[in-house]
From Swiss-Prot:
Entry protein name: Protein P5
GO cellular component: membrane; viral inner membrane; virion membrane
Localization of this protein: Virion membrane
UniProt entry tagged with the keyword Protease: no
UniProt keywords, alphabetically: Capsid inner membrane protein, Membrane, Transmembrane, Transmembrane helix, Virion
Domain of life: Viruses
Protein topology in the membrane: Single-pass membrane protein
Lineage: Viruses, Varidnaviria, Bamfordvirae, Preplasmiviricota, Tectiliviricetes
Transmembrane segments: 7-23
Protein source organism: Pseudoalteromonas phage PM2 (Bacteriophage PM2)
Length: 160
């Protein structure tokens, strides 16, 4: 038996599911468990909680789980609120996705329309998870995460 066939037979016998096309076709943020596409820090300094040990993507952070990635995003949003007073969709997205690199206005409109939250309304504990969910959708073209996963990551990052 050829090595490749033997490997596949062994994997099947062990109950290992292999879906390489699904993994490879997933958006980069989903593959990296970084659904908000947080970029690597320029200083190479402190590690995020739950950051993956293997740094295979030189541009974007990689996390052990999606909830760790959502937590990191919520941590950044907390900094935006506390340090910069950015607590609306418009304020957050203007900083998160600056015009030099993004269609910021389209991003703001997408999140506002998806959530039904006015772009200048101050966010709260009930509205942040919906905004994060819409941002994940915008960043990746889809959002496979449940409300509970997003809320857990938000609360852990914003208040933890």
């Amino acid at each position: 038996m050829k090595k490749a066939h033997m490997f596949l037979a062994t994997a099947a016998a062990l109950g290992v599911a292999m879906f390489p096309t699904q993994i490879n076709e997933a958006a980069r943020g989903l593959r990296n468990n970084n659904p908000l596409n947080i970029k690597e820090g320029s200083d190479g300094g402190a590690q995020w909680e739950g950051e993956h040990e293997l740094d295979l993507d030189p541009t974007f952070e990689e996390f052990k789980t999606p909830v760790h990635g959502i937590r990191a995003g919520a941590r950044i949003l907390r900094t935006y609120a506390v340090k910069y007073g950015l607590e609306s969709i418009e304020g957050i997205i203007a900083r998160w996705a600056p015009e030099e690199e993004n269609d910021t206005e389209n991003y703001i409109n997408f999140v506002a329309n998806k959530t039904g939250i006015p772009r200048n309304q101050k966010l709260n504990d009930e509205t942040y998870p919906a905004v994060i969910s819409a941002m994940i959708d915008m960043e990746n073209g889809s959002n496979p995460y449940t409300y509970d996963e997003i809320k857990k990551g938000f609360e852990w990052g914003f208040y933890g």
